[in-house]
Amino acid sequence: MKRSVKTIGLLGMAVAPLLALMSAACVTRTAGTAGSTVVVQPQVASGVTVVEASCTPGAQEQCNGLDDNCNGAIDEGCGYSSGQLQVTLAWNTGADIDLYVTDPNGETIYYGSNTSSSGGHLDHDARGNCGGSGAATVENVFWANNPPRGTYKVEIHYWAGSDCSTNAGPTPTTLSISAGGRILGAYNYTLVPDQRIPIAAFPL
């Protein structure tokens, strides 16, 4: 299992403040809302590529971490949940990539703590070739209703523990964020083994 002392140490170590790593681009208001809360565009970490929106109304979802059919939800019908807030990570190698979403209360949802008191859930934890199941390489965190107001932070980590060496090499990832029935953003980043980075921060 990857639930090792090394993992605990990683979670406890100092990480540069997320907002300090974000691009300096202005954060602009969108027309959408999540519940009664105004949604603003996420701030994106340096080196993260913003994916230009590309979807087709009525298209089949491809289970790729994107909204393929323009309905504001990510990968519905792919075996994991949507909600008033959804963060979905996808990749296409045998790597074991982990998604971390920290809510405004400071609780982090990830494989070692898959629910939060604010109502967040990790309902799909993929281990790539480390899991041996052949399951889809997707991780998904969602709030079905009433996500708390405040700033959310999203990080990803390429697990490279001694219990599983996949030799998957650098792995491109896609991450999308949906709130209140609209896509806030979609992002690409290529991780290397044992790398953990902040991807985005966004307020609701």
Show where each model-derived region lies.
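Bacterial N-terminal signal peptides that target proteins for export
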Residues: 2-15
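N-terminal compositionally biased, intrinsically disordered segments and leader/signal-like regions
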Residues: 8, 31-34, 50, 138, ...
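Intrinsically disordered, low-complexity segments enriched in serine/threonine/proline/glycine
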Residues: 14-17, 37
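C-terminal motif of bacterial Sec signal peptides marking the signal peptidase cleavage site
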Residues: 22-25
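Bacterial signal peptide processing site
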Residues: 27-29
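Repetitive, low-complexity intrinsically disordered regions enriched in Pro/Gly/Tyr/Ser
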Residues: 33-51
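Extracellular calcium-associated, cysteine-rich motifs in secreted modular proteins
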Residues: 47-82
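Intrinsic-disorder/low-complexity signal
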Residues: 76-204
